[in-house]
């Protein structure tokens, strides 16, 4: 959810995330994937059995995690009634793509559902995305339903 125009959900794209991250001191290496209305962008190399260490979530997690940025802002709005119809649709599209990506990553790297977490759960990260209400009441149930099919 870095560097996205909050008021224009139809413009939530992974290329905006990449451009925003690329301009930072760490040169865009703070996440493995960006997901937006334009699809999934891979920002760091992935290898069989291992991933490139990234920066961003917190040192304890950076060495052992795959990080995904979802384009947009205020995903909790979808569940609190504050989202416009365009915002809801954008979140639904981005969520569906992210769920597909997470399932592939879970299968490839033997990641359990308990180890799929939001940035807001990382102590000291200072991040609130994608939003605890959204993640716990929408994303995780959708992910679990897809895994059980």
Feature names for model-found ranges:
Residues 1-2, 70, 120:
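Residues immediately flanking
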Residues 1-47:
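Short, conserved "active-site rim" segments that organize catalytic pockets and cofactor/ligand binding
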Residues 24-27, 34-36, 52, 57-63, ...:
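Extracellular/periplasmic catalytic domains that process cell-envelope and extracellular macromolecules
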Residues 47-48, 92:
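Glycine-rich anion/phosphate-binding loops
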Residues 49-54, 76:
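A short local loop/turn or secondary-structure capping micro-motif enriched for an aromatic residue
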Residues 59-77:
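Short coil-to-beta-strand
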Residues 73-149:
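Basic/polar, cationic surfaces and motifs that engage anionic cell-wall
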């Amino acid at each position: 959810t870095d560097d996205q125009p909050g008021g224009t959900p139809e413009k939530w794209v992974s290329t905006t995330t990449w451009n925003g991250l690329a301009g930072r001191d760490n040169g865009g290496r703070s996440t493995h994937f960006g997901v937006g209305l334009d699809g999934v962008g891979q920002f760091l190399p992935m290898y069989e059995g291992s991933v490139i260490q990234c920066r961003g979530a917190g040192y304890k997690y950076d060495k052992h995690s795959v990080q995904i940025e979802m384009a947009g802002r205020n995903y909790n709005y979808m569940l609190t009634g504050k989202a416009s119809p365009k915002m809801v649709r954008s979140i639904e599209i981005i969520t569906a793509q992210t769920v597909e990506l997470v399932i592939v990553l879970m299968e490839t790297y033997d990641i359990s559902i308990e180890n799929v977490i939001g940035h807001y759960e990382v102590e000291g990260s200072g991040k609130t995305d994608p939003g605890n209400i959204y993640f716990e009441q929408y994303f995780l149930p959708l992910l679990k339903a897809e895994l059980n099919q």
